[in-house]
């Protein structure tokens, strides 16, 4: 007589992962407006550099990192971050501009642009849909993790509104 393995697998799966027909965990909603903090930990890889005359250059860099919310709130926490950045230096004067996509554990994301002072929310998905606001930041430079790489810790103070 053949015995089916399915009942045993279902029991083992239930014990390991919870109820087969269990209640899905509720996704934490973002309040309609607020202020909080998050810190991003970045590794930076300059992709292209063009050196020009008279202390001038342009650099395109890719930033990869994660965020943590030190206030213990569930939003803007454990997000993976992917950014592109341009750094322009003209006769020693530097400015920068970039854009990022931050995605949380639920798959919800924010999109931002940034300059040397703050990130600016241009929208999002899921709990971040309709987000506007800004996140001024400071930069702590870490030792380089390897040749041609940089690393930073960037604390942000974010103020947002859902529209």
Q: Whereabouts are the PLM-identified features?
A:
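Bacterial N-terminal signal peptides that target proteins for export
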Residues: 1-9
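Well-ordered, non-transmembrane segments within structured domains
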Residues: 2-3, 15, 104, 120
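Bacterial N-terminal signal peptides
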Residues: 8-18
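Beta-strand-enriched cores of mature, soluble protein domains
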Residues: 23-163
